[in-house]
Design a protein with these regions (language model features):
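Polytopic alpha-helical membrane proteins, predominantly small-molecule transporters/carriers
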Residues: 79-84
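Hydrophobic alpha-helical transmembrane segments of membrane proteins
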Residues: 1-78, 92-228
């Protein structure tokens, strides 16, 4: 990683700075997600669909807002001269942005995943929803990492916006497509938690894409000798 002890201290300070900027917005997203989980757990058809939609929308918005606040807006506001004045290498700055964004996103993401698992396992909701839900959340995490990776290496705001829109328009087709796979869809309304080969394959593919994004973006920044 080519990062020394001093870089770790700088990374920590930059991560804390991003957290301080985002904490109020993060709190509002957490409140909204708790409302969504409450609606899902009410056990009524209308509240389930409204709550599920709210969870998806807020989870997407939380990720997009984090990327725009800590990466795209800083670039748009021409903070590069300030960054160059800091005693930080391009690699350390990359890791600070990656860790800040991932740690921020993990708060709403973990809340939704844990909350969904609890509701599925301990309420009358069919247990078969668990695998389907985890695959959807894994897909959301995957496209978040791809969007973040693009923001970290592509300077054009237009291209970053295009990437985000293109990725998030794939959410609905993915949800429907996964549900149409027999090994997955046939268990959704049952109490059977089945990790079928297609489900495991999709889950592993999502993690592979995330690992690939981190590997490629870190390699690109490792080759940089300056911010220019």
């Amino acid at each position: 990683m080519n990062i020394n002890a001093y870089d770790f201290d700088v990374i920590k300070l930059l991560v804390i700075k991003d957290w301080q900027i985002y904490q109020k917005q993060l709190a509002s997203y957490v409140v909204g997600l708790l409302i969504g989980l409450t609606l899902v757990g009410m056990g009524k058809a209308w509240s389930f669909y409204v709550g599920a939609l709210l969870l998806l929308v807020l989870l997407i918005c939380a990720g997009v807002f984090a990327i725009q606040s800590s990466v795209l807006n800083e670039r748009k506001e021409h903070t590069l001269p300030f960054v160059m004045s800091l005693p930080v290498t391009p690699m350390a700055f990359y890791w600070s942005k990656l860790l800040a964004n991932v740690s921020i996103y993990l708060v709403p993401f973990t809340l939704v995943v844990a909350g969904t698992a609890f509701l599925v396992l301990f309420t009358p909701l069919p247990d078969g929803l668990l695998v389907w839900s985890l695959l959807i959340y894994g897909f959301l995490a995957m496209i978040y990492f791809v969007s973040l990776g693009a923001a970290l290496v592509v300077e054009s705001e237009g291209w970053n916006t295009f990437v985000m829109i293109a990725l998030f328009t794939m959410v609905s087709p993915f949800i429907m497509g996964v549900g149409m796979i027999d090994a997955i869809g046939t268990n959704i309304k049952t109490n059977n938690i089945v990790w079928s080969p297609p489900a495991v394959g999709i889950f592993l593919a999502e993690f592979a894409v995330i690992a690939l994004v981190i590997g490629v973006t870190s390699w690109i920044h490792r080759r940089k000798t300056s911010f220019l």
